[in-house]
């Protein structure tokens, strides 16, 4: 069903999945809208699982919200496998079906997935994802009659102008000097795709909580800003604190 849904836009598959997962279609739509809020989609409302308009009324969303949803979905291994599949063979007791993916962009070597769409209100819509030089990209277009070429042009421009910059290094996270904590660290490197001008406009700000006893404890956050807009929040940890030995405690220890 998932392959039929994603490769061939099977609306019948969408309804069957909704009924099975949600108990009924209406409840599944409620689940869809709840998930949209969790993902951060502020300008989206789902009215059915197929995406089709009914009596001139249908789901509504924005390119940005669809990009947020796609980023969330690409974290799922099964989803990533399905959307990059060019063709799938489905067999029943009576017949064998070969479903070819409608996403022609899969022939472009950097493409990792995506989804085509069409409704009377939105016309041609297309979401695609690509990976290049360690960077992941998402392009979303709505009402674009030449969407294939638009996506290719945008990717070529992005690949040319963006570079994956190491903003925070796990190995060399020693730029912060703080007398309260010893051995602050982060768990992962932070790479961010940026243009040259953006790379020179980043601001790093660290905010720490004062915790008395810590043992590999979350003690704060390293915020990254681009032109006054927060674009990343990196958790900061402190290794186990060691009891400080004072001069008088050393003297006292001599008489034990």
Where in this protein do the model-derived segments appear?
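Active-site-adjacent loops and short helices of periplasmic peptidoglycan-processing enzymes
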Residues: 1-67
């Amino acid at each position: 069903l998932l392959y039929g849904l994603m490769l061939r836009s099977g609306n019948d598959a969408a309804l069957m999945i909704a009924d099975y997962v949600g108990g009924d279609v209406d409840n599944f739509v409620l689940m869809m809208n709840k998930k949209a809020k969790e993902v951060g989609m502020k300008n989206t409302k789902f009215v059915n699982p197929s995406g089709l308009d009914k009596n001139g009324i249908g789901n509504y969303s924005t390119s940005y919200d669809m990009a947020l949803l796609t980023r969330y979905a690409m974290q799922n291994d099964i989803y990533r496998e399905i959307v990059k599949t060019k063709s799938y063979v489905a067999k029943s007791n009576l017949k064998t079906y070969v479903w070819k993916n409608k996403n022609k962009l899969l022939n472009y070597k950097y493409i990792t997935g995506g989804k085509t769409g069409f409704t009377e209100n939105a016309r041609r819509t297309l979401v695609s994802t690509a990976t290049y030089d360690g960077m992941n990209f998402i392009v979303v277009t709505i009402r674009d009659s030449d969407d294939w070429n638009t996506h290719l042009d945008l990717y070529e421009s992005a690949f040319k102008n963006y570079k994956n910059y190491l903003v925070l290094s796990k190995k060399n996270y020693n730029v912060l000097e703080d007398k309260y904590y010893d051995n602050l660290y982060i768990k992962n490197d932070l790479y961010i795709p940026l243009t040259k001008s953006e790379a020179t406009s980043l601001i790093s700000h660290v905010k720490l909580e004062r915790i008395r006893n810590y043992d590999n404890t979350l003690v704060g956050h390293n915020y990254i800003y681009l032109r006054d807009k927060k674009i990343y929040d990196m958790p900061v940890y402190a290794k186990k604190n060691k009891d400080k030995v004072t001069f008088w405690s050393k003297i006292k220890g001599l008489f034990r």
